[in-house]
């Protein structure tokens, strides 16, 4: 199974644009924008990154560990480092939503580095993504817009506060 140790290598494999920051990437398609599509299919892979994404899958399944995620109504998905991901060409994405990806070392030396391991939504025990109401989706999109602004404008050490 292929494993990606850096965020850049993982995004390159997915055929997505490289990150603005070596340990953090933000892809946002809020409003009239479109999310870039990852490569069409993938055998099982792992990486050293966390991902938080809001996606809608028009058809097909994304396999995460032993679980198939249901994205038809739009849902937040949380992926932890070294979790197994796999998808095939049957997956068709709606190109709206967002994806925030960060290397586990991005959190090094922070309280969140210890706390994040307690969040069950990053583990296999969560059998499906977190489904959002339209109101919740708008609230999350607003937060992500602010994160994206910070990501695009501040690439120094203070960006770790994101």
Regions found by a protein language model. Name each.
Residues 77, 82-87, 107:
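Histidine-centered metal-chelating micro-motifs
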Residues 1-63, 67-69:
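Generic protein-terminus/edge-of-domain signal
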Residues 153-162:
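All-alpha amphipathic helical-bundle segments outside canonical DNA-binding/catalytic cores
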Residues 66-80:
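Short acidic-glycine-tyrosine-enriched beta hairpin
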Residues 13-16, 88-153:
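A hydrophobic/aromatic-rich effector-binding and dimerization subdomain
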Residues 46-49, 73, 94-96:
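A structure-centric signal for secondary-structure junctions around beta-strands
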Residues 57, 81-83, 102-104:
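Residues immediately flanking
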Residues 45, 133-137, 159-160:
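Amphipathic, non-membrane alpha-helical segments in soluble helical-bundle scaffolds
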